[in-house]
Amino acid sequence: MIKLFICQKKYYLTAIFLLTIQSCASVEYKPLVTGATTAIAPNIWPKVVNGSLFQEKIPINYGYQPLFEDHRPHNIGDTITVVLQENISASNSSISNMSRDGSANFGLKIAPGQLNNILGVNFQDNTTSLDSFGRNNFSGKGSNSANNKFTGLITVTVKRVLPNGNLKVIGEKQVSINKGTEFIRFSGVINPTNINKNNFISSTQIADARIEYLSHGGLDDVQKMGWLQKLLLKISPI
């Protein structure tokens, strides 16, 4: 009974150890777009009958559209279609060369002139010299380039109207194909004057744009590194 308890305890300790190293090896993904990905317009305000043509007591005009009002979105819950046109390329290169040379010469007197023939050796030159020379060369070269392109359409909703009239928008699109799901999330700040008559706006005209593309499915699992490989990669000295 005692042996069985010790064996079970070893199994528990092993399981705890494996879970610990797995959590250390995993990399937490932080999404760019956080919070709710849609916005719902508030309830329609009750109509105020005050005997005038213009209902000035209604602070916002949900539920009706004045004849001469700009039809572009400007209220919470309004929808806008964003044309994704992201094409970013960057490259850099660096070359460095360093060289250093040094030399030294030292002259030493072997013996005084009176002791020149004591050992039966005649030193024609009663001095010797020590020469030292060193050289250090370094050459390095590196280059890096990246090219990213993202095109498509996504319809977003107005989440908040800023004090200056700009619109904070957010949206998400999900597409499921063959047991795999793809997500496109978007958020940013739009100037309503940049929205065209067809209710479209280019992503290049949106400030603080955050575009996120994710996929969940078999292909996504294949692209992930196993926890043991991550752990070995972290502790590997090379």
UniProtKB/Swiss-Prot annotation:
A lipid is attached at residue 24 (S-diacylglycerol cysteine). HAMAP family: FlgH. GO terms for biological process: bacterial-type flagellum-dependent cell motility. This is Flagellar L-ring protein. It comes from Buchnera aphidicola subsp. Acyrthosiphon pisum (strain APS). A lipid is attached at residue 24 (N-palmitoyl cysteine). The gene is flgH. Its main location: membrane. The lineage of its organism: Bacteria, Pseudomonadati, Pseudomonadota, Gammaproteobacteria, Enterobacterales. It is found in: Cell outer membrane; Bacterial flagellum basal body. Keywords: Bacterial flagellum, Cell outer membrane, Lipoprotein, Membrane, Palmitate, Signal. Assembles around the rod to form the L-ring and probably protects the motor/basal body from shearing forces during rotation.
